[in-house]
Amino acid sequence: MLPAQHKLNSSMQFRTVMRKGRRAGSKTVVVHLWDSAESLDGTEKQGEVASFGGPRFGLVVSKAVGNAVVRHRTSRRLRHICASIVEKSPELLSPTHHVVIRALAGAGNAPSAELERDIRYGLGKTSRVRTNK
């Protein structure tokens, strides 16, 4: 599945990604992406969010998705998609990217191909560099 080095594992890490990151939504998921390399300005604690070992993922699957069986199945499918993105598409994310994927109510019934398409769309949209004109 998803190795420990690719997981967000504290509420502070989730909070940082959700508050400081960019987000893109679709019918089934909302993708929050935060690049720790461009956001660290010296005012934060160094240990707040680890930025080594590759991109890190966190999942939020609420009761809106369905009962416990549906939520756990959805979580397993999302973890598998994240692992395949890390393995097969390393150009999509840098090692300093931290991603939180929030499953919406439609994610429980959506096919895996649709979930993967929506996650890739969200990652592509949030990882684009913004330019000020």
Swiss-Prot record:
Listed EC numbers: 3.1.26.5
InterPro entries (UniProt xref): Ribosomal_Su5_D2-typ_SF, Ribsml_uS5_D2-typ_fold_subgr, RNase_P
UniProt entry keywords in alphabetical sequence: Endonuclease, Hydrolase, Nuclease, RNA-binding, tRNA processing
GO biological process: tRNA 5'-leader removal
Claim: RNA-binding is one of the keywords in the record: yes
Main enzyme class: hydrolase
Annotated GO MF terms: 3'-tRNA processing endoribonuclease activity; ribonuclease P activity; tRNA binding
Pfam families the record matches: Ribonuclease_P
Gene Ontology CC annotations of this record: ribonuclease P complex
Family that this chain belongs to: Belongs to the RnpA family.
Stated role: RNaseP catalyzes the removal of the 5'-leader sequence from pre-tRNA to produce the mature 5'-terminus. It can also cleave other RNA substrates such as 4.5S RNA. The protein component plays an auxiliary but essential role in vivo by binding to the 5'-leader sequence and broadening the substrate specificity of the ribozyme.
Protein known as: Ribonuclease P protein component
Organism: Corynebacterium glutamicum (strain R)
Lineage, opening ranks: Bacteria, Bacillati, Actinomycetota, Actinomycetes, Mycobacteriales
